[in-house]
Amino acid sequence: MKYDIIGDIHGCFQEFQNLTEKLGYNWSSGLPVHPDQRKLAFVGDITDRGPHSLRMIEIVWELVIHKKEAYYAPGNHCNKLYRFFLGRNVTVAHGLETTVAEYEALPSHKQNIIKEKFITLYEQSPLYHILDEKRVIVCHAGIRQDYIGRRDKKVQTFVLYGDITGEKHADGSPVRRDWAQEYKGQAWIVYGHTPVAEPRFINQTVNIDTGAVFGGKLTGLRYPEMETISVPSSLPFVAEKFRPIS
């Protein structure tokens, strides 16, 4: 099986459509379909900050749950939106406010449809996907070699948030260790979460979050070709979001 793994979309539907078309997908049915049966995989954070979060929920639900033709690994923003939809006490900030504004603008029956679709998508998707006979792992923020196969709380925190130190940057964002430098595994780890100006290949890992929602690019990785394809963002460039990885 061949896959096209898509970086953090964050509600940037137009960029997603542009990227999938560039990757050879046809949208005539209203969904991206590849003539060679390639499958899409998502590294999570499909919502928040961008203009079309609900559209992305509907598309990914359709591909992953209804048609079972794609793979989705949730990100930290997905986890927070899931908790919001469950009625938990979450702070509606750091991007969630844009998704909530879209959601609250809907009539109540459409709100229920979106909520049920996202809850189903989240609950029926694993923390990470092990694909191609364990040769590639698709996850949100990365995974250590010794965590592969585990799904406990410690691993969940790592996969959703990265290798956080507990410290904070001046803007309040968490300081993260560069776990990819220490990775010695044979499986490719394809992930996102931390915006980088260009896809970052370190050992057998590649970060494909190229900051689409911050004016960078939306990137897809063609696997097993290991070729990255990007399209430019239509949003304003926010330079401080592309911080060097410590």
Swiss-Prot record:
Respond yes or no to whether keyword Hydrolase is given for this record: yes
Q: Which UniProt keywords apply?
A: Hydrolase, Nickel
Q: Output the SUPFAM superfamilies linked to this UniProt entry.
A: Metallo-dependent phosphatases (SSF56300)
Q: Name one GO molecular function term.
A: bis(5'-nucleosyl)-tetraphosphatase (asymmetrical) activity
* InterPro entries, alphabetized: Ap4A_hydrolase (IPR050126), Bis(5'-nucleosyl)-tetraP_PrpE (IPR023937), Calcineurin-like_PHP_ApaH (IPR004843), Metallo-depent_PP-like (IPR029052), MPP_PrpE-like (IPR041780)
Instruction: Report the catalytic activity.
Output: P(1),P(4)-bis(5'-guanosyl) tetraphosphate + H2O = GMP + GTP + 2 H(+)
Q: Which cofactor does it need?
A: Ni(2+)
What EC numbers are recorded for this enzyme? 3.6.1.17
Taxonomic superkingdom: Bacteria
Any GO CC annotation of this UniProt entry: cytoplasm
Q: Which HAMAP family match?
A: PrpE
Q: Family per UniProt? A: Belongs to the PrpE family.
Role according to the record: Asymmetrically hydrolyzes Ap4p to yield AMP and ATP.
Q: What is this protein called?
A: Bis(5'-nucleosyl)-tetraphosphatase PrpE [asymmetrical]
Organism, by scientific name, is Bacillus cereus (strain B4264)
